[in-house]
Regions:
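Structural detector for short beta-strands of small beta-barrel domains
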Residues: 212-229
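OB-fold/S1-family single-stranded nucleic acid-binding modules
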Residues: 266-276
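Short nucleic-acid-contacting surface segments enriched for D/E, G, S/T with interspersed K/R
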Residues: 249-265
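N-terminal nucleotide-binding beta1-loop-alpha1 segment
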Residues: 1-22
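Conserved donor-nucleotide/metal-binding helix-loop-beta segment in metal-dependent transferases, i.e.
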Residues: 110-136
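Conserved alpha/beta core of the MobA/IspD/sugar-nucleotide pyrophosphorylase nucleotidyltransferase superfamily
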Residues: 162-214
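Short phosphate-binding loop-to-helix
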Residues: 65-101, 157-159
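A short, N-terminal amphipathic alpha-helix
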Residues: 33-49
Length: 276
């Protein structure tokens, strides 16, 4: 009988409390936490047949599906902290018949599906293995084949995982440096590296490609006016009129109602992305 394929698990904490070290306006920080989670989940979902999210946010599954991410979400059910949440997710995955669990952090905006598959293949000789982050101190992925996941994320997690018996997967074993799978994001410097590697669609929508950095955050109000090309105009909090292309509304908004206030990032007088 063929070995069942691997399944992935990610634990997501409320966006309001995520990425507190990013020195950007709070609405943009929250948006970045969301888009990075979306890009991490999108890559994992393209590589694996099943992905489970563990969270205490009741509306999260519906929000993810509206964003185009079809994954199952289960409650933390009193399992406080990332390690308890991941352990709960791993138990559910095993009960569903999957022999291999791939636990991943939710702040890998540059993650590519092929890197996930490379890591999965390199992990086969080991019961438990992990991918250290770019600093070598933390962990971005932990894999377990037919054994307990026993996650030790947060802090000096690479050393903790190694001490627990998990093997650190090297670039030589993987066959690639997989910089995208090691670049988690906590600071602006981390984000700059991730953008340089190439981030997923959700995070990329916030990037001004002329500068290679985030667009400028603006709180905008939709108006009834349009420019010469028929595109809707919005007014910034400082009174400037800028263009709101339909494409900037993404999956969350079909249109901006007159008088509606939105968060946004803009560049050169055009909104790059807008959200509620």
């Amino acid at each position: 009988m063929a070995t069942p394929p691997a399944a992935g698990v990610i634990a997501l904490k409320p966006i309001a409390h995520a990425k507190s070290r990013l020195a950007v306006p709070d609405p943009l920080r929250r948006r970045l936490a969301w888009t990075m989670a979306l890009d991490s989940l999108a890559a994992l979902s393209r590589a694996l047949p099943h992905v489970l999210v563990v969270s205490d946010q009741p509306a999260l599954e519906a929000e993810l599906r509206r964003a185009g991410i079809a994954v199952d979400v289960i409650s933390e059910s009193g399992h406080v902290g990332i390690n308890s949440a991941l352990s709960r997710g791993a138990q559910v995955i095993r009960a569903q018949g999957f022999a291999t669990v791939v636990a991943c952090v939710g702040d890998l905006p540059a993650l590519r599906p092929e890197s996930v598959l490379r890591v999965l293949e390199a992990s086969r000789p080991h019961r438990r293995s992990f991918v250290a982050d770019a600093s070598g101190v933390g962990t971005t992925m932990l894999l377990a084949h037919d054994v307990d996941l026993a996650p030790q994320f947060q802090g000096r997690s690479a050393a903790a995982h190694h001490a627990s018996g998990a093997e650190s997967l090297s670039a030589e074993e993987i066959g690639s440096p997989i910089a995208d799978a090691r670049r988690d994001v906590d600071t602006e410097a981390d984000l700059a590296v991730a953008i340089g590697l190439g981030v997923g669609l959700a995070t990329d929508a916030l990037v001004d490609h002329e500068t290679g950095w985030l667009g400028r955050y603006e709180l905008i109000t939709a108006t009834q006016w349009c420019d010469a090309d028929g595109e809707q105009l919005v007014v910034t909090s400082s009174g400037r009129r800028i263009v709101l292309p339909v494409a900037a509304l993404g999956n969350e908004l079909r249109h901006a109602r007159v008088g509606q206030r939105l968060h946004s990032v803009e560049a050169e007088g055009r909104v790059l992305s807008a959200w509620l």
